[in-house]
Swiss-Prot record:
HAMAP family: HTH_type_SgrR. It comes from Shigella flexneri. Keywords: Activator, DNA-binding, Repressor, Transcription, Transcription regulation. Residues 163-492 are annotated as: Solute-binding. This is HTH-type transcriptional regulator SgrR.
């Protein structure tokens, strides 16, 4: 019998007997474990060989045998739990231990660096599963970061300085305002072993043609081997950066036929997905990666939903006891914000917008927040920390305003905290706030209506590119804000848009109301090198490494 199964049987037997040695019979024990008398005898003999108990059998009708426990079920359970932790079997660990507080304590004690069989392993604790990693779909902040570790694109954007770099394409040139040419590397391999072909690249770029920022791509052809020509309907100075975004990452052309591709995707990036469940995401360095091989061999993201109720202060990479910690922090490039829905009567009413933005001002929200959140929140007066576009102007409550509807996407604890503060403030003004939580996909598509939406945005470098690109990619915003998005996109592509003025107009009309900038924090280990926090609150796994202990 496998060791894990035998351990489970012993723990069950120990629990049924309340850990007490006793006189009993094979029949009674077999009934406790719901097995045959013969199998029970085999179990007892095997457990005795392991030194867990002694079984002194007595022969004869009515005779009772002596069962003596030499090992406690708790000790064996702890040993089994340690084995499961080392094997990263978090789903089985949860089933074994049951108690969530105990599971959490065990997980936290094993966070950070691990060195096993010559491999460097990094363990991170996160509050929710990362089940959808499909480029081009609605991806949240953390999924966006993970996708960048799994996939490659024609170009890539340096997370630290926002500069454009080569990726699958080693060079590119603009032939004319409507014609770009990219030169691709040969010998690039997917995680499942197949070599990248030009058909994969063409199919990947054609599949995103329905997205607003890629809709001006009219034709994609390969005139010669490893050469790609892209033709446009309008000039686009940002095209090389667009092709480095997550939606434009390269998938195998057969991706739709591969099982569970969204949760177990296959790319050409530095890490390959090994496991992705509700309890754990495990990615492993790809030895055949065409760039520099990742220095951390394996990254395990352990999922513990219970930490969602704590202030989202960032990632904790706790190391061994006594090891000094390094803390890196930055104010996010983005903010939580209110979005008024012009499709509803109250959302479109300028008096309602003025009054709500006055009573739910950033300073009011921070003032009514608990201290643990006040330490992480900074009042926002623009979409970026450096902008001061919003002005708090006293406004009178509109006559007849008795209720409002606020909607946000689920699995985000701070949304609930902020919404609760808003509900409290509005109630003091005799206005009922009805709160709705929907899925992220529903939020992203924005097909349902709500007076107000509570959203958050994190913009990546370079900001003059990503800010408009991010807002334009969210259908919800286009439903709620009745401006000419296509005309604005054309001006943006031509470099004719003053982005600060454009955002200031959105804030001045109260279409968007900035609320809070959040401090992003990584609590790392002193032995970890190359850890540079990006604007998504994560760091590039492939560039980080562990320094050996001091001699």
């Amino acid at each position: 019998m496998p060791s894990a199964r035998l351990q489970q049987q012993f723990i069950r037997l120990w629990q049924c007997c309340e850990g007490k040695s006793q006189d009993t019979t094979l029949n009674e024990l077999a009934a406790l474990l719901s097995c045959s008398r013969r199998h029970m005898r085999t179990l007892l003999n095997t457990m005795q060989d392991r030194g867990w108990l002694t079984w002194e059998a007595e022969v004869g009708r009515g005779k009772r045998s002596r069962l003596t426990f030499l090992y406690t079920g708790l000790a064996l359970q702890q040993q089994r739990a340690e084995d499961l932790l080392e094997q990263d079997r978090i789903d089985q660990l949860v089933q074994l231990v049951g108690d969530k507080a105990t599971v959490r304590q065990m997980l936290v004690s094993h966070l950070g660096r691990s060195f096993r069989q010559g491999r460097h392993i990094l363990r991170v604790l996160y509050y929710r599963p990362l089940r959808n990693l499909l480029p081009g779909s609605a991806l949240r902040r953390s999924e966006t970061h993970i996708a960048r570790q799994i996939f490659s694109s024609l170009t890539r954007i340096n997370e630290e300085n926002g500069e454009l770099e080569a990726d699958i394409a080693h060079h590119w040139q603009q032939i004319s305002p409507l014609h770009w040419r990219f030169f691709l590397r040969p010998g690039v391999h997917f995680h499942h072993g197949r070599e990248l072909e030009m058909d994969d690249v063409i199919a990947s770029l054609k599949r995103i043609n329905t997205l607003p920022l890629y809709s001006h791509i009219t034709d994609i052809v390969s005139p010669t081997p490893w050469t790609l020509d892209i033709h446009l309907t309008q000039p686009d100075r940002w095209l090389p950066l667009l092709l480095g975004q997550v939606p434009a990452m390269i998938l195998p052309c057969e991706w739709e036929t591969l099982s569970n591709f969204a949760s177990h995707p296959i790319g050409t990036g530095p890490y390959a997905v090994i496991r992705n469940s509700t309890n754990q995401l495990k990615i492993q360095a790809f030895d055949d990666f065409f760039g520099y091989r990742a220095l951390i061999d394996e990254v395990n993201v352990w999922v513990l939903p219970e930490i969602a109720d704590e202030p989202a202060g960032g990632l904790m990479l706790k190391g061994p006891q006594g090891e000094k910690k390094e803390i890196e922090s930055r104010l996010e490039e983005g903010c939580y914000y209110l979005l008024f829905d012009s499709r509803t009567h109250r959302g479109a009413n300028q008096q309602v917008r003025d009054w709500v933005s006055y009573v739910l001002s950033p300073t009011n929200l921070v003032y009514f927040a608990e201290e643990q959140y006040q330490q992480l929140w900074f009042p926002a007066y623009g979409l970026l920390p450096r902008w001061h576009h919003a002005r708090t102007i006293k406004s009178e409550k509109p006559a007849g305003l008795e209720s409002l509807t606020l909607t946000f996407y689920q699995d985000h604890s701070e949304h609930r905290v902020i919404a609760g503060i808003m509900q409290q403030i509005l109630a003091s003004h005799q206005v009922t706030l009805e709160i709705k939580e929907i899925s992220y996909d529903q939020w992203h598509e924005g097909e349902i209506e709500s007076d107000i939406w509570l959203n958050s945005a994190n913009f990546t470098l370079p900001l003059d590119f990503s800010l408009f690109a991010h807002l334009c990619e969210v259908p919800l915003l286009q439903h709620c804000i009745p401006i000419d998005w296509q005309a604005d996109a054309a001006r943006w592509r031509n470099g004719e848009m003053n982005l600060a003025n454009w955002c200031q107009q959105l804030v001045a009309s109260k279409a968007m109301v900035p609320l809070i900038h959040h401090w992003l924090i990584i609590q790392g280990q002193r032995s970890m090198r190359g850890l540079r926090m990006n604007t998504l609150g994560w760091f590039d796994f492939k560039s980080a490494w562990f320094a050996p202990p001091d001699p």
